[in-house]
Amino acid sequence: MTNQDTTIRPTPEAMLKLAQAEEAQSGQGRLKVFLGYAAGVGKTYAMLEAARERKRDGRDLVVGYVESHGRSETDALLAGLELIPRRELAYAGVLLPEMDLDAILARKPQIVLVDELAHSNVPGCRHEKRWQDVEELLAAGIDVYTTVNIQHFESLNDLVAQITGITVRETVPDRLLDIAFEIKL
């Protein structure tokens, strides 16, 4: 008995190359989410370590907004990365720093780091929420690395309130997890 099946199967490498080509043609940036369960668990640190690896690989990468919270280890990881200066916006008589979305779009890096996805922007920003800024960056074809805690996702808001007794006011639509090309815990 002979096998008449002469179908040639593509190699995994060929399939990966095809998927990457299709992704590049879509014009849409890719989202990488560094997900944590609480403040201080190392999301920003992990994001910066991944960013430094991409930089060593030759990727064009900028820091759109990272909050080090005064941690020297986090500040050390920022050294040598290109920082997009923050915008200062007046609110309630105080100047507050915000991510400069227009400067990032004008610079058009391959990858931008955007800390604190659930952040509410100061009135006067183009978008009410930072996750909306991220959607605009993705639509412009820029890959985004971002950080967020699990309790900020809309579908978990009620559950978190029941467990902790705290209502989380800054929420992120679940669809951002759905579109993420990678989620790091």
Residues of each region from the PLM?
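Extreme N-terminal, non-catalytic leader segments
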Residues: 1-34, 64
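Loop/turn-to-beta-strand initiation segments
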Residues: 60, 108-111, 137-146
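Conserved P-loop
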Residues: 28-106
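Short gly/ser/thr-rich secondary-structure transition/capping motifs
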Residues: 15-18, 92-98, 165-167
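Conserved nucleotide-binding/hydrolysis micro-motifs of P-loop NTPases
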Residues: 53, 67-72, 118-119, 144, ...
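Anion (oxyanion) recognition and catalysis
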Residues: 55, 138-139, 177
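Conserved ATPase-coupling elements of RecA-like P-loop NTPase cores
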Residues: 116-131, 155-158
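Internal gly/pro-rich beta-alpha loop/helix module
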Residues: 146-185
